[in-house]
Amino acid sequence: MTVSELNEQAKALLETHFSFVEVTGEISRLIRHSSGHWYFSLKDEKSVISSAMYKFSNQQVKFEVKDGMQVTIYGKLTIYPPSGSYQLLANKMLPVGIGELELAFNQLKSKLENEGLFDIKFKKPLPKFPKKIAIVTSLTSAAYQDMLKVINSRYKLCEFIAFNTLVQGEMAAANIIQMLQKADKMGFDAIVLARGGGSKEDLWCFNDENLARVIFTLKTPIVSAVGHEIDYCISDFVSDHRSLTPTAAMVDLLPDANTILQSLDIAFDKFESFIDGKFQNSFNILNLINQSLKNQAISQKIEKANLTLENKKANLENLITSKINNLAHKIKEFELVFDRQEQFFKATKNMVQIEKNGKIMPLHELQIGDEISIYSQITKKNAIIKS
């Protein structure tokens, strides 16, 4: 028997009897090879074992592995025939004492925070009266429908464009990045990144490091509205504003039309009171001057003062008239814009968009048997062309 044959037989025997092992220990001498494989030692107080984790396995590890970290490894024992060395081949690795996702979240949060990506000095203010907003979310989600309800009931002077994206799974982060970068180039006043509630695993794509760095570079103010109030994602910290829910994002961004009209009424009343006060103050001053000049019998000064007062009164009346006319004109413009938006919403209420395999299709290009999706402003239906 040759040495090679002996090593191969020993390898087969070892892998047969130890095809699955669960071992807990401390990582030491970790080497990340250029091939993508990891080589390290796993040790406790008394012993150490050489270990390896190939690229296709370590790519599934979500947290950052470091020397000194306590981990549990799932794998098998084997022998590396060229050297005859006995080693542990890891298929899966989990941290000890804390969940894998929680550790990965805390590590990334600390890393980005130390780099300054969460610093308040980089936060862009949200527009007070937005005219054009992008919504990046799944168009089939309940969260999107809830947002539309708030839009239709609260403020109709703003244009909304939705960017359909995955919001869950391995491909979601890359898809979201693509949609955010596309929206950022289109001159929106704000972007809303939204998703409804879900488990930590469901929301994990919003903890992607590449996504966080892209959000930080966006020129457009962005609102992160992911999950429920208790759910925190990395996107919440790096965005310009965090809303508790997708519905809350619409409330945070959109002013209430009724509140705007009430504010205009209040402003007009305050302005009117201010002008009345100015008039009264001027008349009081005039009376004091007249009283003072009576004893001096200099009617010429009184006439001059009266003339000055009349001029000031005329100027003030012209100013008041101008201000009131400007305010009335602005209110009229506001009402006209509001009416046009209302008519637009009514006119397009029953318009639909046809998609086949995610692509917008004209009606004349559809064939019998095609499976299509029909979208309106408030719903979606699936159908099959029969004739």
From Swiss-Prot:
Claim: Phosphoprotein is one of the keywords in the record:
no
The EC number(s) given in the record are: 3.1.11.6
Q: Which UniProt keywords apply?
A: Cytoplasm, Exonuclease, Hydrolase, Nuclease
Q: Which GO terms describe its cellular component?
A: cytoplasm; exodeoxyribonuclease VII complex
Entry-linked InterPro entries: Exonuc_VII_L, Exonuc_VII_lsu_C, OB-fold_nuc-bd_dom
- List the GO molecular function terms: exodeoxyribonuclease VII activity; nucleic acid binding
Short name of any one Pfam family annotated for the protein: Exonuc_VII_L
Q: Where in the cell is it found?
A: Cytoplasm
Q: Which domain of life is it from?
A: Bacteria
Broad EC category: hydrolase
Catalytic activity from the UniProt record: Exonucleolytic cleavage in either 5'- to 3'- or 3'- to 5'-direction to yield nucleoside 5'-phosphates
- GO biological process: one example: DNA catabolic process
**Function statement:** Bidirectionally degrades single-stranded DNA into large acid-insoluble oligonucleotides, which are then degraded further into small acid-soluble oligonucleotides.
User: Subunit structure, per the record?
Assistant: Heterooligomer composed of large and small subunits.
**NCBIfam families listed in its UniProt record:** xseA
Q: Which family does it belong to?
A: Belongs to the XseA family.
Q: What is this protein called?
A: Exodeoxyribonuclease 7 large subunit
What is the organism field in this record?
Campylobacter fetus subsp. fetus (strain 82-40)
Q: What is the lineage of its organism?
A: Bacteria, Pseudomonadati, Campylobacterota, Epsilonproteobacteria, Campylobacterales
